[in-house]
Amino acid sequence: MVSRKQKFWTVILVIVLAIVIIGGVFGISYMKGDVTFPWQLETGKAKTEEVAEPAKEELKVTVVEPESKEPVEEDIEEDATKEELVEEPVKETDAASTGVTLDYYGALHVEDGVLTDEEGNAVSLTGVSSHGLSWFPEYVTADSIKSLRDNWGINVIRLAMYTSDYNGYCVGGQDIKDTLKDNIDEAVQAATDNDMYVIIDWHILNDADPNEYKAEAIQFFGEMVRKYEDNENVIYEICNEPNGDTTWDDIKKYANEVVPVIRNVDDDAIILVGTPKWSSDLDSVLDDPLEFDNIMYTYHFYAGSHKSSARNTLTNALEEGLPVFISEYGFVAADGDGAVDTKEAAKWQEVIDEYQLSSCIWNLSNKAEGSALIASDCDLTADFKYEDLSEQGQYFFDMLKSIDSSDNEKEEELSDEVKEDVNQKESQLKEKTKQTKSNTEKRR
């Protein structure tokens, strides 16, 4: 028989065991996070899962890197496109060195003393003259000319073929003639391929009077015009720098026999005619100009030697309506050497810009003289770096870039049609950006 005392302790034992079992169950649940006690909420001890869950939601937003990066990439693309929009109108302006192209302007002609395109818009060619083809033929190759166009924005190349002097056309044998004509042909083709104009220059110098080799000139230009009559980009310069005792009457007599040879084949080609005193005397031409269409008269200057008086000669002729082409110039002295005269060079450039004159700087070579555009210790013939250029080469390159930049900034020079086109493209760009950001579409 069980006593009361035994019953009492049996009940106590059962209760203790129950407490232990229940406590163990709750303890395990608490550790797993399955149970939250009321007093825990008051002390801020939230359930582990409730703390972790918002963190998981936040992670989902920040982990999607393409979405967060896409607007940044779109901004970059937008900026790049805007740069293209700024550069594009430069091709619509006449003064921009990089804007004049054969494809855009086509065949040129002279109208009221100004070089113009087919629609009568003034055209300003900015170019480089070679040195003598017999001395430095490596600078008039396809690679060299393409480099000038792509890296410098040059749109005309002048091919200086000496008539006398070293391996001149008129003093060498047939092999010399053939080599020079091959040089010209490669350069003309390269200029055409690169959307440029090209000047074939009958480069008299020590022969002084163009009449000395007039028969050779007639034969040469007859051959050239028949070969290139379909090339709208070819310009003929029939006598570089008449000098010594040669007068305008002498030059006019020569021109009246050579120009018809070209005109018999090509009615419209631009023909450049040299003037007395190393192509610096325009006054005598004003009194008695040639009676042909599409004729321009050459004027040469070197900033280190020719200053205000020479500029007055040029501007007076221009004001009188004489069509002038600066087929050769330099920023150094007239002997082709010395340092750049920056003060006078800037004044000359102002005249060129004001009258929208076409010009070719002398000379593309690495000859050890101030007028060479390439440093004498540089053996490259294309893709020049800035440090590969001479003092004049660097000055010229900087000038080209400043002209290009200033024209880009002159929004007022753009036609209303061009402005409207630019604004329309910018609006389309902004709309595209909004759509890309909202839809996160893949850009083309």
Tell me the role of every PLM-derived stretch.
Residues 35-101, 416, 420, 424-428, ...:
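N-terminal, intrinsically disordered, polar/charged segments of Gram-positive cell-envelope systems
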Residues 141-205, 214-219, 263-265, 341-355:
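Aromatic-lined substrate-binding rim segments of carbohydrate-active enzymes
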Residues 106-108, 132, 137, 197, ...:
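Extracellular glycoside hydrolase catalytic/binding regions
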Residues 119, 123-144, 163-178, 334-337, ...:
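Acidic/histidine-rich helix-loop elements
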Residues 163, 205-206, 331, 366:
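Conserved beta-strand edge residues that scaffold enzyme active sites
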Residues 397-412, 416-421, 425-444:
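Short, low-complexity, Pro/Ser/Thr/Gly-rich segments in the mature regions of secreted, periplasmic
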Residues 1-51:
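Gram-positive cell-envelope targeting signals
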Residues 36-44, 83-156:
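N-terminal carbohydrate-binding accessory modules
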